[in-house]
Amino acid sequence: MSVNSNNSENLIDIFIDELWLEKGLSKNTLSAYRHDIHSFSLWYKGSSLLEVQRVDLLDYLSLRLKEGYSSRSTARSLSSLRAFYSHITVKYNLKENPTARVDSPKLGRSLPKTLSEEDVIKLINSPDVDDNIGLRDKAMLELIYACGLRVSELINLDILNLNLRQGVIRVIGKGEKERLVPMGEEALFWVQKYIEEGRPYLLKNDNKVSELFLSKRGKSMTRQTFWYRIKEYAIKSDINKDLSPHTLRHAFATHLINHGADLRTVQLLLGHSSLSTTQIYTEVARHRMKELHNEHHPRG
């Protein structure tokens, strides 16, 4: 079976389309698959991805690790390539799946990057709330930290999914799972202020965008835009850490546990399907306690 002379981009496009049709994966997940396979395709100089051998994959994975990519990132890349080659091995009747005898890199259990409560406050207070964009950013930072949202959940949050009277939001998480999360007084105040004073100026007259948070052009926000804004505010706040929107989700969970919240509650608020995923935040809390003990105890 041929596909336009086995053009690599066509192979990737067809795989992504069929993956969406068969499994109904989210846009972000499909984008991650495409990125991983496309990155390998750019590295591979053969005439077609159908000609890839096991040794090519081993060389590629080895190079990634040498260039400083983490074991976790490299394992994810291999996982995407496994799915791709499992699919096309059958579809194009390949003699062998080149990923079949390739082992994943061993993963150490790394602790999530988080922020102290003091740094979170500095970050959240850094936007200029007298400006419509700054007011939007203030509301976004307050909300993502107050509710422990994933960045995709934040930027896709529909204004109709807010219950301002009760102070809760309806979140559509991974696998279209829904959960209700309380906002807290500070986040509620700034979100309401943004809706009343900032959002009307960002929303264009002919625009019917239902997402809560809008770009300066009146369209839906992107993950990249919010990531960039966080980087700017980190610099402004003199926070010398590599921050991402997910850092505030980690901070939300860690700070809840530091203040005595039970794991089951944190699991429900985060939308984790497994309690074991949430348990890593107890390790973060213990690690931080050890750091403070070593730093401040006279015999630490």
Predicted regions and their residues:
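Conserved catalytic core of the tyrosine transesterase superfamily
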Residues: M1-G300
